[in-house]
Amino acid sequence: MIEPARWGRRRAVLDAFDRLHLARPAVRAYEYGLAAKSTLFGEGTRADDGLPLPPARMRTQVGPLHADARFFLESGRHNADLVRSLVPFDEVGALLDWGCGCGRVLRHWSGVHGTHVYGCDINTKMVDWCNEHLPFADVAVNELTPPLPYGDAEFDLVYAFSVMTHLSEELQGAWVGECRRVLTPGGHFVFSTLGEHYVSRDRLTPDERRSFEAGNLVVLYEGSPGTSLCSAYHPRDYVARELADGFDVVGFRPAADDGRHDIHVLRKRP
């Protein structure tokens, strides 16, 4: 986890690059560097679960901490276990990992019986990797904007880790509506957000912090949605007020996953 002082310096550098329209190339270069370091020090091609390990370059696109193969695997398992603990999983006949990337969480449904496993992502290379190496799952490409390539009420569970955290406010509203469409009545939508834990680490300017504390969504680098550069910070009340139309809010866990994201659990109304 980046310390507040270091984050402040990183934010200043990113802001400077953003003014020059160079922030996205800078982030990509940073990711390439992390991947190269991981590859240089060597790593296996298969994990302890017997499934292939995605290449370091793919993992760093999911998040810089995932250059570490162990963290990639352990955090994915933790999130899968977290999902199981939040919903009545024995009632889930079909689940969708929206924004599955290269299968960080998806891979941990390998041994599940009685549940059809689906995933989708905007990155075609990651989708191809999942379909080749995670044969128990059916993974499809989606665009940055809805719709998803699925029919109405197909899934009992849709979950999204580190997806809403990288979308503009407009896109978030559209995607919540789309997730509601593909859920069965009574189905659950579980997703992560950046909350008070991240704000408390001086991720925001004083003005941005005041806006967050007033209950407003704060989105940094909103012009780069769908990338790790774009970062959205959600007050808990904002989610209940603006993102739960047609849902009941049935669960909330602050700083609950290995990335210290807040976890929200919504249930679709009949």
Predicted segment positions?
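A short acidic, Gly/Pro-enriched loop at the edge of an enzyme's catalytic core
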Residues: 147-158
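Conserved beta-strand/loop positions that form the S-adenosyl-L-methionine
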Residues: 98
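A short glycine-rich, Lys/Arg-flanked "PGG" loop and its adjoining helix->strand segment in the class I
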Residues: 173-185
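Surface-exposed loop/turn positions
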Residues: 93, 152-154, 187
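Class I (Rossmann-like) S-adenosyl-L-methionine-dependent methyltransferase catalytic domain
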Residues: 2-94, 102-147, 169, 174, ...
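A short SAM/SAH-binding and catalytic strip from SAM-dependent methyltransferases
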Residues: 157-170
